[in-house]
Amino acid sequence: MILAALMPCFDASARRYRKKDAVFRVDIRQDEKLRTDFQQPLALMSCIGLKYDLEARLRSYVAFLAGEELEGRAMGSAGSSAAAFFISGFFRNAGLEVKVNTFSSAGHTGRNILGMKRYPGANRYVVVMASYDGLGRLGGKIYPCADANASGVAALLELASDVHKPVGRPKNFIYVALDGHNVGMSGGEALVNYLASQGINPSSIAMVINLDTMGSTLVPPSGSGKDYLIALGGGQMAYSMMYSNTGLNLDLSYDYYGSKGFTEMFYSRVSEQKHFLALGVPCVMFTSGITDHTFKTTDTAATLDYPVFARRVEFIRRWMRRF
């Protein structure tokens, strides 16, 4: 009922950007099922001022991105193009300046989607990113990649919609949906090069936040309940994180399950923040860890714990407001 009521607002806003986004190959207008599924989550952002439940929004974003119609969002696929189209429209509806960073890797064309919010007098940047490509269809089976990493993209969208006036010295915000995670993390490298081409060098980036696999509670760290969140690289900001966690009561961990080796691997080698770390940029990677569903056909939207997921996103939102 709520979504049906929102559809006129979506249709009005969609006309503003559909022509601009014609570069994306998939034509959602010709596929009524995909068009309906596409409109539902985007409609939640189309009417400014309408309050809607955070948990329900996250469910809607993940359900669309991990749905059968997008077939796992493999880089260069029609499903990936549909996801890119959706994300760019979402950013535009949120009032962000949208840029598309196109790159090639392993014979595929990738697209990083950037949503930028600049503030007068600000000369430093905070980059918030999540990879949106998945494994796609392998051996005739679809790998939905809901937790890894439709969940991170859902968190990214929610944070991008919270355009706020920073506390203290203002910083510009760049929200990035990265392509190419499953093709050598090529989107992260392409992003570094693209930002440099725009005059945004490592010295002007105050922080990079990577949202990578955010929605599960199946593998809590030792001594924690299911209400946990892992923040690799966050130890030096433990006080501000503790303050932002007031009332949310998440169990925050600053290492990967107590293992120094795995912490170094996940923080420095197996996700896109590694490209920025190599340049000396401070980074935090938020994750809920790998589960038995990761990189399997069972990584579906139904396996996520949305009440806890919503609290994680709210925590990151509060923490970012302190920048």
PLM-predicted stretches and their roles:
Residues 64-66, 113-116, 125-129, 174-177, ...:
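Structural recognition of the beta-strand scaffold that forms the well-ordered cores
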Residues 43-52, 68-78, 103, 140-149, ...:
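Second-shell loop/turn segments in exported
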Residues 115, 128-134, 138-185, 316:
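Alpha-helical metal-binding/catalytic segments enriched in His/Glu/Asp
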Residues 168, 178-283:
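Metal-dependent peptidase/peptidase-like ectodomains
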